[in-house]
Amino acid sequence: MKSAVFLDRDGVINRALTRDGRPYPPSCLAEFEILPGVAEACAKLKQAGYLLVVATNQPDVGRGTMKQEMVEAIHADLCRRLPIDRVEVCYHPGREASECDCRKPKPGMLLRAARALSIDLARSFMVGDRWRDIDCGHAAGVTTILIDYGYAESLRNMPHHRVSSLAEAANLILDLAAE
């Protein structure tokens, strides 16, 4: 079985648009900007043998305020630019989330990818910037790493580790693997 690093998209891989202290996803390709150091961090993790899986909630599609084709275009661009092995997406808005198993903080996206790619969750990581990512990682049984931007929201579960960027998270993962 393989080890993986599960990555939230907005705020971890690409710049999240921030309004009133809260992050929002880009609504078009022109707004999709990969953060500095992300390409190098992903390359480092791939070279060390990790699978890279994006797990992202995109409820604006379910709400009808964004087209699924635009999300797919953003993911196609993402996969052209970074060595991503799989992208898992939940389109369910909050009201429908109680009926799905995939919207973070539920672990469905991670569990689905783990089955498809033969991932050992006990040797894997979830890197995110919000409480939903951390709770999802805990529910899936992976080590959680919070990229702490100081958003105006409280954590429900404490992350195993806190960092300031994906580059720092990648270095931490490689250090932990060497122990």
Sequence positions of predicted segments:
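Active-site flanking residues adjacent to catalytic metal/cofactor-binding acidic residues
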Residues: 7-9, 56, 128-129
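Active-site neighborhood of HAD-like aspartate-dependent phosphohydrolases
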Residues: 1-51
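Asp-based, Mg2+/Mn2+-dependent phosphohydrolase catalytic module
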Residues: 3, 69-86, 95-126, 130-179
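Substrate-recognition element of Asp-dependent hydrolases with the DxDx(T/V) motif
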Residues: 38-71, 75, 84-93, 137
